[in-house]
């Protein structure tokens, strides 16, 4: 075949709107390669659709043979005739194929579908199924060249799209509807059993042709099993029996899912929830295994794109799923599927949302952060996530955006401002720098900067030279004493209580959020040239003497605390420090105020007028049990 004339179109894409094509949105294909995506540079662009990848797919034509193929380059996947195209692989396009750029089974209004029409006479003749004695063209889901002569009042794809079109009746015109030709048995090469047909044709036959008891069922097709994936790339392979047909016919006829099933369906895997987790604050729910893969590449909710703060188990929904499966045991996942999901589950307890590094997207809000919403598991996709690695793992590659290792070079010490980098020191930099993580070693995520570090907490119990990695009170992990936290604005998220840097604003509202009483304390310290650090050291000394009390008897000046636990205990000590200031050392305007009935427990003391009128550095006297 001679080279194609660029001015003469070799194909056409018509937008599908329900059962009709939109003639106003027909696109003629001239170029050798036609790209589809969200980028504005694509030939067919969807700039406002977040479900479309930047470069979603591309349609190419072989100028010599005239063959047209589609290559998927997306994250969410491209669907042709409701069969998933494996990423980075090509799929031959034939006259009448329906291309789903966006396919949502439970949200058909969001579907973006196009009908491909070949305008190349050579390609039509190449796929002409004139031979009805078992020709290869009939087995590979081809259409008649008579399509060129038909009107497009009601175009039909080459495979069954019963959820999109509403005309299941047979047609006397071959080429408009492949199902009609197949029902007569001629295009299947004389085979009377659908189980002897190729998987591509098997997928194209509607439910009404598979079983006489299932006529009239127009529900969406059941989810294909994964063994179908390699059939789409080997169209000449015809198995002795089709397991898909056997699987579908052994179950109840396809029906629309009931409201309860829709409510209990995970939008990522499109199956009933398994080990359900909820995201906070939006409270959307997903399978724990599904969201485990998602959270490694995006910190946004898959449903509403709201930033996720916490991940929690949803026990109520888990109980509802169990009750639903008791009534519908046929919808239960297989044992192999459940074991696979349990192995991929990384959410074993309530946890904070880990921080995700987004460095490979060239557009804000790129859908490359979206999870693979398909039937293809992670082992068959090239976007599977590696094991968690930190800067001490062997083979770790430091990105240009990676912060410098702790401790930083000495020439930068003088240029730091308070809060721009860790402000406290550690006694274990040498041992930390020499450590190398074992292969696939355990890691823990810092609560402050959300960066991974080696989990050596158990090792520290036997080796005091290993730096502390968690708070003594809340047991949350922090990396500051291990190798220095690099989060901007961190004052030192983990340190001994006496070395904690609480910041200059730690005295604001320090006394039960009572700004008036807090200002009295600040003025008292300023008049004597004292700082909050001096007050903390005096209070810790009073704790040692037994004068001041803390709620946890383990806390002293050397106890390793995080910033939040340290600030909370600092406020407790500050109240006792203010309570022990002699009245003679305070202004008369302060000591002349009567005590509030509610004392330190007063909920009105945050109001300036009430705080100025009454003293709240006292105990409650009214209604005290």
Swiss-Prot record:
The keyword Cytoplasm does not apply. GO terms for cellular component: nucleus; PML body. It is found in: Nucleus, PML body. CDD domains: FHA_CHFR, RING-HC_CHFR. Its EC number is 2.3.2.27. InterPro entries: CHFR_Znf-CRD, E3_ubiquitin-ligase_CHFR, FHA_dom, SMAD_FHA_dom_sf, Znf_RING, Znf_RING/FYVE/PHD, Znf_RING_CS. This is E3 ubiquitin-protein ligase CHFR.
């Amino acid at each position: 075949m001679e080279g194609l004339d660029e001015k003469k179109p070799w194909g056409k894409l018509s937008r599908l709107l329900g059962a009709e094509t939109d003639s106003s949105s027909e696109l003629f294909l001239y170029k050798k390669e036609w790209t589809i995506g969200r980028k504005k540079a694509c030939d067919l662009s969807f700039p406002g659709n977040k479900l479309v990848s930047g470069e979603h797919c591309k349609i190419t034509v072989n100028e010599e043979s005239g063959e047209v193929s589609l290559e998927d380059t997306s994250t969410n996947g491209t669907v042709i005739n409701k069969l998933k195209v494996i990423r980075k692989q090509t799929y031959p396009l034939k006259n009448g194929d329906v291309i789903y750029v966006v396919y949502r089974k439970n949200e058909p209004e969001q579907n973006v579908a196009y009908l491909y029409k070949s305008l190349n006479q050579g390609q039509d003749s190449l796929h002409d199924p004139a031979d009805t004695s078992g020709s290869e063209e009939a087995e590979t889901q081809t259409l008649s060249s008579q399509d060129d002569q038909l009107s497009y009042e009601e175009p039909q794809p080459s495979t069954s799209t019963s959820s999109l079109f509403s005309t299941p009746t047979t047609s006397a015109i071959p080429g408009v509807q492949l199902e009609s030709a197949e029902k007569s048995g001629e295009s299947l090469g004389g085979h009377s059993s659908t189980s002897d047909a190729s998987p591509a044709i098997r997928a194209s036959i509607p439910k009404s042709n598979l079983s006489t008891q299932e006529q009239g069922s127009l529900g969406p097709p059941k989810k294909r099993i994964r063994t179908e994936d390699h059939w789409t790339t080997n169209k000449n392979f015809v198995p002795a029996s089709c397991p898909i047909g056997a699987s579908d016919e052994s179950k109840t006829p396809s029906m629309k899912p009931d409201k309860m099933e829709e409510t209990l369906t995970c939008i990522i895997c499109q199956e009933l929830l398994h080990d359900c987790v909820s995201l906070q604050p939006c409270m959307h729910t997903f399978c724990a295994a599904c969201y485990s893969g998602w959270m490694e590449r995006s910190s946004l909710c898959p449903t509403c794109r709201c930033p996720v703060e916490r991940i929690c188990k949803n026990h109520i929904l888990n109980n509802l799923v169990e009750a639903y499966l008791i009534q519908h045991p046929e919808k239960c996942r297989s044992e192999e599927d459940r074991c696979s999901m349990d192995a991929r589950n990384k959410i074993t307890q309530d946890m904070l949302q880990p921080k995700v590094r987004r460095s490979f997207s060239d557009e804000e809000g790129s859908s490359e952060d979206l999870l693979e919403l398909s039937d293809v598991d992670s082992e068959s996709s090239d976007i599977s996530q590696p094991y968690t690695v930190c800067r001490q793992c062997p083979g770790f590659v430091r990105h240009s955006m990676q912060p410098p290792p702790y401790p930083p070079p000495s020439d930068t010490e003088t240029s730091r401002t308070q809060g721009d980098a860790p402000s406290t020191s550690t006694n274990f930099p040498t041992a930390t720098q020499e450590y190398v993580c074992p292969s696939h070693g355990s890691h823990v995520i810092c609560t402050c900067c959300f960066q991974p570090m080696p989990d050596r907490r158990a090792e520290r119990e036997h080796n005091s030279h290993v730096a502390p990695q968690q708070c003594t009170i809340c047991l949350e992990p922090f990396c500051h004493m291990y190798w220095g936290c690099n989060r901007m604005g961190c004052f030192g998220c983990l340190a001994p209580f006496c070395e904690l840097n609480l910041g200059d604003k730690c005295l604001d509202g320090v006394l039960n959020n009572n700004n008036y009483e807090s200002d009295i304390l600040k003025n008292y310290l300023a008049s004597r040239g004292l700082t909050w650090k001096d007050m903390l050291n005096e209070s810790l000394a009073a704790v040692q003497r037994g004068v001041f009390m803390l709620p946890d008897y383990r806390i002293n000046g050397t106890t390793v605390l995080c910033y939040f636990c340290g600030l909370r205990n600092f406020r407790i000590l500050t109240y006792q420090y203010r309570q022990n200031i002699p009245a003679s050392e305070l202004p008369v305007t302060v000591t002349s105020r009567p005590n509030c009935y509610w004392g330190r427990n007063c909920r009105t003391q945050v109001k300036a007028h009430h705080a100025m009128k009454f003293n709240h550095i006292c105990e409650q006297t009214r209604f005290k049990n």
